[in-house]
């Protein structure tokens, strides 16, 4: 047992024979497996669709700005919400992180200047103790489901499991989701009833 990390590896497709998963095919090799967990966030549906699994997980883009603090007395001490712009502002050591927004624009990670201006305006208006010119600007895709609940559980293909669709709460739900999926893969009964988390709820 144990874990082997494979950096720089791209999963190209699932290896499925009949109604059973046999492993995955990567850009380097074929990896045999008794069970496969698809945990690719917003990209999960792209891997599954060729196998007839319709997964309603959609990419919803969010933006963040990380700003170095130049005046600690004019920086936040704890996390706050700017309800006008629906943006969270928090302190990360000697930096201010401001993030939020929800944009439906497909699988794009482009960084629009208007979004940056909104983030800068929000944080600098409330906490002018940072150097916005030195900020790092980032966007990412949140894997959202229609009902806001993640998809965790088995699929119609034996040995193929899903752990995706956590939306904005990926880190928050990561440990609990990992426990549930580990139990399901191992044939144990999870501590919670996970029936309604499976993709079959959308059938």
Swiss-Prot record:
Keyword Oxidoreductase recorded: yes
Gene Ontology terms: cellular component: cytoplasm; plasma membrane
Coiled-coil regions listed: none
UniProt key word Oxidoreductase: yes
Transmembrane segments: none
EC number: 1.-.-.-
InterPro entries reported for this sequence: FAD-dep_OxRdtase (IPR006076), FAD/NAD-bd_sf (IPR036188)
One MF term in the entry's GO annotations: D-amino-acid dehydrogenase activity
Sequence similarity: Belongs to the DadA oxidoreductase family.
Protein name, as recorded: Uncharacterized oxidoreductase y4sL
